[in-house]
Amino acid sequence: MGRSFEVRKASMAKTAGAKIKVYSKYGKEIYVCAKNGGIDPDMNLSLRHLITKAKKDQVPSHVIEKALDKASGGGGEDYQPARYEGFGPGGISVIVDCLTDNGNRTFQDVRQCFVKTGAKIGTPGVVAHMFDHQAVFQFKGDDEESFLEALMMADCDVTDIELEDGVITIYAPNTEFFKVKTALNTEFPDLVIDVEEITFVPQNYSPVPEEDAEKFQKFLDMLDDCDDVQQVYHNAEM
């Protein structure tokens, strides 16, 4: 693909307040996933992946269990996905994914993040075409060919595989996520996968102009503070 995948996830927040926000976002996402697809992780593969991801991010078991109990009880909030696109400070392409029970409130909250930092919120699709919706797996290794061969034998559709500085990154269509994950776990049972997610990968990265760097970080921080924002994707070269 001619580019390296940049994992820019913030490390686990150290302050109690920030941790609570992370737990809240996972709790909401697990609740929605379980409510829509069932609370049994063995039957709901998306839920199984989400729980695994939450545990990797050190989300306490009681947060996960509470979300599952809430989903099993029926009723509760009716969260809907919402996506907003636009250009952040410095012209950086941005996709903001939310879960909301009040679309008007969420739109206004996200819009204020754009407005207060001189950014521009756009119409649906305005920047999505600049990203590839991919399944991404990343782990330590030095022989990418053996992994590619194993995935080909498992009839997995692989978009690209890269080796850089002792780290192997596998890209596949987002629809192939569970197929690739199963093949890796089956063929390489001792493999420790550091990143396994469905994400929007920028087709090209853009440097943030020096004069916009502080404002861009403020923009990201404001979005992170929005209760309904679940994930932010951008093409900034950090």
From Swiss-Prot:
Source organism of the structure: Vibrio vulnificus (strain YJ016)
Q: What is its main location?
A: cytoplasm
Q: Which UniProt keywords apply?
A: Cytoplasm, DNA-binding, Transcription, Transcription regulation
- From the Swiss-Prot or TrEMBL record, state where the protein is found: Cytoplasm
GO BP annotation list: regulation of DNA-templated transcription
Q: Name one GO molecular function term.
A: DNA binding
GO CC terms for this protein?
Answer: cytosol
Q: Which family does it belong to?
A: Belongs to the TACO1 family.
| HAMAP family found in the cross-reference section | Transcrip_reg_TACO1
Q: Name one Pfam family in it.
A: TACO1_YebC_N
Task: State what protein this is by name.
Answer: Probable transcriptional regulatory protein VVA0010
Output the SUPFAM superfamilies linked to this UniProt entry: YebC-like
